[in-house]
């Protein structure tokens, strides 16, 4: 029900399932919705009982868009949501949907029928998507550094973004053994590096390291893009 429905005001606490930025276009709507609710009901505790976006570890884009099911859009979505929640510290609870991909018989999306791919980890529990490491950067005290989009090896651009997640305050990036830059910040670090031929990048944060390889190609790798077909679940993204 909506925020004005009397049912929404029976309990002491309330949470909504909201997928603004996934089923509904516009990530910024999350901020507007929360601000509006808090303006109208300043004493009413608000939570998010579900939020998420689907992401496939085999689908990739350097310009991710809502509905493309790429690992990159899922990460972009969760980056926004975590910053959004941090801006609204009066919220009482948030519940990411979901930790793992799960069976959903009526769905036919992302190139794998019968599954919901909103998990931070694949259904078999073997592959941690980039979004998993984003939450680790925000929530975990275990020191780590993670280079994103490792599976997005083939790139057509002459300059690429190397995104790094870490819970350390400083991250240095090396390209083919040469230091390309160092940044201080929180959670998300972004570097621009030239891409000619094949490169190996290494991220260093304290005593933590991570490596990845990328190569320049003339034409996009077709396996990175989802080919959508009409299905019984076409009403979903």
Residue ranges and their predicted role:
Residues 227-237:
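Compositionally biased low-complexity segments at domain edges in trafficked proteins
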Residues 1-180, 184, 190-210, 218-224, ...:
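Extended substrate-binding grooves/exosites of carbohydrate-active enzymes
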């Amino acid at each position: 029900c909506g925020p004005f429905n009397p049912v929404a005001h029976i309990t002491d606490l309330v949470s909504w399932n909201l997928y603004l930025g996934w089923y509904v276009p516009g990530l910024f709507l999350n901020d507007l919705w929360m601000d509006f609710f808090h303006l109208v009901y300043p004493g009413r505790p608000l939570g998010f009982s579900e939020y998420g976006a689907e992401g496939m570890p085999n689908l990739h884009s350097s310009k991710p868009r809502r509905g493309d099911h790429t690992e990159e859009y899922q990460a972009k979505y969760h980056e926004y949501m975590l910053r959004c929640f941090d801006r609204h510290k009066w919220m009482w609870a948030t519940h990411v949907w979901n930790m793992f991909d799960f069976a959903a018989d009526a769905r036919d999306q992302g190139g794998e029928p019968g599954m919901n791919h909103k998990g931070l980890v694949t259904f078999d529990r073997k592959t941690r998507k980039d979004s998993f490491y984003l939450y680790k950067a925000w929530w975990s005290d275990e020191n780590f550094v993670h280079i994103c989009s490792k599976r997005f090896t083939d790139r057509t651009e002459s300059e690429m973004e190397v995104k790094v997640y870490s819970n350390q305050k400083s991250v240095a990036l090396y390209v083919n053994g040469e230091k390309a830059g160092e940044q201080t910040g929180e959670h998300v670090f972004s570097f621009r590096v030239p891409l000619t031929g094949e490169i190996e990048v290494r991220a260093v944060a304290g005593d933590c390291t991570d490596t990845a390889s990328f190569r320049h190609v003339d034409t996009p790798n077709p396996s990175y893009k989802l080919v959508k077909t009409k299905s019984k679940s076409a009403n979903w993204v």
